[in-house]
Amino acid sequence: MAPKIFIDGEHGTTGLQIRTRMAGRRDVELLSIPEAERRNAAMREDMLNSADIAILCLPDDASKEAVQMVSANNNVRVIDTSTAFRVNPGWAYGFAEMDGAQADKIKAARFVANPGCYPTGAIGLIRPLRAAGILPDGYPVTVNAVSGYTGGGKQMIAQMENPDHPDAITAPHFLYGLPLTHKHVPEMTVHGLLDRAPIFSPSVGKFAQGMIVQVPLHLDDLAEGTTMESIHAALTAHYAGQDIVTVVPLADSKALARVNAVELEGKDTMKLFVFGTPGGSQVNLVALLDNLGKGASGAAVQNMDLMLAS
């Protein structure tokens, strides 16, 4: 019998993308609430408890409510795509390539917290350098990022695409999170193995899907003897043996005139780059991904597949 999967919030941006990725699969059975019954709390609870894996694509409070509904049913495993549980030690963090043991933790977990889009890029760049002893304690990490507007869900999609929307956004690019208290900062700090919260400056561009995350570093403030080449080598070693996260060779990065935020649109992979001048004193680490791919729905399906393989 095929495992039953219920996407709670299947009509939202992330939920719809998950359904698209699972279309045509015969190895799982998708449970679904008829659209006319979407507000039926009893039916929702029944669906949650009938699933082998429930994928929650909900706001934080609604996710917490859903987890309570299945807390006594050990037959139900959960993948949550909100920020509610990402730094909860009782939940496996759903970034399988984060370190060598993470995929096995996800396979064995009952509860998996799907990573945020920005943290996927930031942690993907930072954690290997912390693990290798290159990025020292106390380093003032800065993360700058731009996302496609679908990361803001249906409301922002309407604001960006409908010029008649009462709160339409006409700017081609805008900063937000200006008080430096973005909800992804704790996640970056904990899973990036940082002892000091990074300064995070997010922004949105007038493109639907895609993301660039940047972490600039001063080499003189890193471990003694660190070079652009040694940083690249540490990243390459960290991600060896898998094909989801790739580290672009230095020669290929050097040949680039620009990085295109939408290059990986529709894909569930991530590319990492190390930019700088050989022998120079600075580097810029860059992660490229689809905010709805490896940054959300693609990661959720990847985590589901790992859990089903356990």
From Swiss-Prot:
Residues annotated as the enzyme's active site: C117
GO function term, MF aspect, one: NAD binding
Major localisation: cytoplasm
Compartments, as annotated in UniProt: Cytoplasm
PROSITE patterns: ARGC
UniProt entry tagged with the keyword Endoplasmic reticulum: no
Family, per entry: Belongs to the NAGSA dehydrogenase family. Type 2 subfamily.
Protein name per Swiss-Prot or TrEMBL: N-acetyl-gamma-glutamyl-phosphate reductase
Natural source organism: Rhizobium etli (strain CIAT 652)
Gene: argC
